[in-house]
Amino acid sequence: MPLLDSFKVDHTRMNAPAVRVAKTMTTPKGDTITVFDLRFVRPNIEILSPRGIHTMEHLFAGFMRDHLNSDTVEIIDISPMGCRTGFYMSLIGSPSAEEVAKAWEASMRDALEKVPDETKIPELNEFQCGSYKEHSLADAHEIVRNVLKQPIGINRNKDLALDEKLLNP
């Protein structure tokens, strides 16, 4: 099985909150697709609660689009990481990590200011959500407040390259 790019970076050296360009590819038609690692907490040190990350998924998806989509950028998907330390965001275009960090910060402010109670969580019903009872706005707001406590940084692949001796054969 091929070694995926996300397993070629040293998770013990990742900072959070931080943006990392996880992958860039060009489609056969010439479009650029960029995948960003949006790391909310430090791997193996902290973890986002299941209910909190699920609620963040609902909030983050819309607010990031509000702040990042443009004539040259269109978000395809924002999905929680299985390790529950952040989200992957795939998009058409190639915004800078700094632009993504700015949009991320603005979307976090929106999550606090525009969603004061659970009735305001988008798509929170059995028809649009596969686990609509698995939410916590309190946990999501705690995640947001923790992100906003410090500037959102940039994790660079060259700084996180995993020593080949540590890679599983």
Curated annotation (Swiss-Prot):
Residues given in the record as Fe cation binding sites: 54, 58, 129
InterPro entries associated with the record: LuxS_sf (IPR037005), Metalloenz_LuxS/M16 (IPR011249), S-ribosylhomocysteinase (IPR003815)
Top-rank taxon, per record: Bacteria
Keywords for this protein: Autoinducer synthesis, Iron, Lyase, Metal-binding, Quorum sensing
Cofactors, names only: Fe cation
Description of how the protein assembles with itself and partners: Homodimer.
Membrane spanning stretches: none
Record GO biological process: quorum sensing
Gene3D superfamilies referenced in this protein's UniProt entry, alphabetically: S-ribosylhomocysteinase (LuxS)
EC number per UniProt: 4.4.1.21
HAMAP family the UniProt entry points to: LuxS (MF_00091)
Known catalytic reactions: S-(5-deoxy-D-ribos-5-yl)-L-homocysteine = (S)-4,5-dihydroxypentane-2,3-dione + L-homocysteine
GO molecular function: iron ion binding; S-ribosylhomocysteine lyase activity
Protein name listed in UniProt: S-ribosylhomocysteine lyase
Function: Involved in the synthesis of autoinducer 2 (AI-2) which is secreted by bacteria and is used to communicate both the cell density and the metabolic potential of the environment. The regulation of gene expression in response to changes in cell density is called quorum sensing. Catalyzes the transformation of S-ribosylhomocysteine (RHC) to homocysteine (HC) and 4,5-dihydroxy-2,3-pentadione (DPD).
GTP-binding recorded as keyword: no
Details of cofactor binding: Binds 1 Fe cation per subunit.
Family classification: Belongs to the LuxS family.
